[in-house]
Amino acid sequence: MGKIKNITKYCIKEFQQLWKKGAFYVFTGSFLTKFVVFFGSMFIVRVLTKNEYGQLTYMENLYGWIYIIAGLGLTNAILRYVVLAQDIQEKYNIFQYSIRESLKYNLVILLCFLGLNQIYPHPSSFENLQLLMSVMLIMMPFQYLLDSDLALERAMFNNKRYALLAFLSSVALIWTKFLGATVQGIFGVVCFGLASNLIFGIGFYVLARRKYFAGFKYSPPEKGLKKEIRIYSLQYMITNGIWTIFMLSDVFLLGKLCDDPTILAEYKVAYVWPGNLSIVCSAIGIFVGPYFVKNENNLSWVRTNYKKVLIGTLGLVFFVAGLMFIFAKPLILIYAGKSYISVAPLLQLLTISAFINNGLRYTTANILAAMGQIKYNMIVSIVGIVLQVGINCIMIPRFGAYGVAYTSMGVYLFMAIALFVVFQRKYGK
């Protein structure tokens, strides 16, 4: 009884400390944001035909590939260098530098890919989407501005405000997309999504300047700091980009090797629930990241809190993943209806894969990146993506979407073990 009492007191104490630091707002905001996106997409999948939903999935996948290099990763610099800045003027200079430089890069990227879209050989089932793909591409600079606005709120440790703004922008985005789907199908989804990102990206930027930097004038950072920011951002972009490729290459290869919109639609539906396991780990990662940045030189603090975060994340993800695995069929019925019930076994396999990814890999990768150890993430990610693409090219023709699930389980486990070994060598006793 004494041990149980001590453990209970310890848990209550830790919870109270997290509450004071704003963890509640981050967790609640992240959960509500993901829930709104999920709940809204449930209506979109029911409004569109299976063929239309497959086409939308194809376009969003291509857009995701391009968004990897958006802003050359400068949003990540906000999360690190605004935190490390000594005064409000320096914070403003870094934030404004990131915004201005990312806008320049995004305009160049946009023009290049608008031209490339005109000559890209889309599969025959998707050839009629060329114009609509161009409209979707125009959304990129505004979406990136919105991401930068939200990154600033995290860097300023204003967790309550971050949660509120993230929730509001997500509600607006998903419901405008749903409205567009009911009015004009996938064309409406794309156009209304563009309008939402434009309004909130610019609107939140104006609000941020008034909130934190009213009366301050921009002064460019020193040359050495600029170089450091660019290098860090580029490394983070490459690392994140490689990881994003894990998410995107599955759909891309399915589209290329199968050339069937219905297969893409079924895979997307099966992945929705496992994909939302990231709610748990991303909420924790959003909250703890800045604290690991501030204490990155305190090895004892890093080791102690890494264990807490890893165990807590693993336990929560295991619990949620277990429920998803058990109730696979009801979850499919809730989200997409009887026409997709056959993908329940695929959902179960993807849930196992998502548990390995979110429960084992993500925490270590996120903390290493926050403390500037990006190169290790990059190396592990490069090896992982080579394995994934190579194995998928063998597995997809034989097993279809199930081949993707089998591949993901093995590759994610390899990456989780590799990153854990790196962390122990850098920060372990």
Describe these PLM feature segments.
Residues 15, 19, 50, 118-136, ...:
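Interfacial segments at transmembrane-helix termini and the short loops linking adjacent helices
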Residues 130, 134, 163-212, 382-387, ...:
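Hydrophobic alpha-helical transmembrane segments
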Residues 21-33, 59, 64, 68, ...:
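Membrane-water interface segments that mark the loop-to-transmembrane alpha-helix transition
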Residues 2-19, 129, 160, 187, ...:
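Interhelical loop/hinge segments that connect adjacent transmembrane helices in multipass membrane
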Residues 17-76, 139, 174, 234-257, ...:
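Signature of the first transmembrane helix
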Residues 22-41, 166-173, 189-208, 223-290, ...:
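Transmembrane helical elements of multi-pass membrane transporters/channels
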Residues 142-165, 293, 354-380:
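Membrane-interface junctions at transmembrane-helix termini in multi-pass inner-membrane proteins
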